[in-house]
A protein has these predicted regions:
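An alpha-helical interface "stripe"
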Residues: 155-157
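Conserved ATP-binding N-box helix of the HATPase_c
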Residues: 2-37, 41-62, 126-131
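Extended, Lys/Arg-enriched charged tracts that mediate electrostatic binding to polyanionic substrates
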Residues: 135-138, 151, 160
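Flexible ATP-lid and adjacent glycine-rich G1/G2 motifs of the Bergerat
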Residues: 55-145
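N-terminal switch/interaction subdomains of large nucleotide-dependent motors and GTPases
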Residues: 6, 21-25, 83-87, 141, ...
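Short, low-complexity, polar/charged sequence segments that are solvent-exposed and flexible
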Residues: 46-51, 91-96, 159-160
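Eukaryotic short linear interaction motifs
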Residues: 36-38, 81-83, 148-149
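Extended, regular secondary-structure scaffolds
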Residues: 49-54, 142-153
Length: 160
């Protein structure tokens, strides 16, 4: 509905929801052009085949032929990062705890994720805005979890 702005609103809400206790979350928002060479390895033949078959992706050949890609870069600080076990397939980790990273990457509208819906983010649907703001319906993210600073993650998903 609001294009890139919806993803910015969602991002800010997520940063507030993930604030580290007694710290004010900070956000940095930037529109930038990035040379395609920086992330060409992420755009595989298999991925392109999926994009070609998606009704959501428009102007694919034009987008893929551009030497620079317009990006929306969203950064947050004083937040917990996306916790959980990325290699565990399920809403719970192997030790029975919630698995937010699985929910973020794989679930849309699967039961309430927060006990207090007033905080926002209670339905698990807002993350779709990141893909809707993308011409190739794709979103990449880098997360540094506050309890695992030495294990940053680079992940992404496409809403095809």
């Amino acid at each position: 509905k609001f294009g890139e702005y919806s993803s910015i609103f969602e991002f800010i809400q997520n940063a507030i929801d993930a604030k580290i206790e007694n710290k004010i979350p900070l956000v940095k928002i930037n529109f930038d052009s990035i040379k395609k060479k920086k992330f060409e390895s992420l755009i595989t033949k298999e991925f392109i085949a999926h994009l070609e078959n998606s009704p959501r992706v428009k102007n694919l050949s034009e987008t893929l032929n551009d030497e620079e890609v317009q990006t929306l870069i969203l950064e947050d600080f004083n937040t917990s990062g996306i916790s959980g076990e990325p290699g565990t397939w399920g809403l719970k980790t192997l030790d029975g705890k919630d698995n937010p990273i699985f929910r973020f990457n794989n679930c849309i509208g699967v039961e309430a994720k927060l006990e207090d819906a007033v905080l926002g983010g209670s339905e698990g649907e807002g993350r779709q805005t990141f893909c809707h703001a993308s011409e190739i319906s794709t979103f990449f993210y880098h997360t540094i979890r506050h309890n695992e600073l030495n294990k940053p993650l680079m992940m992404g998903f496409a809403y095809l």
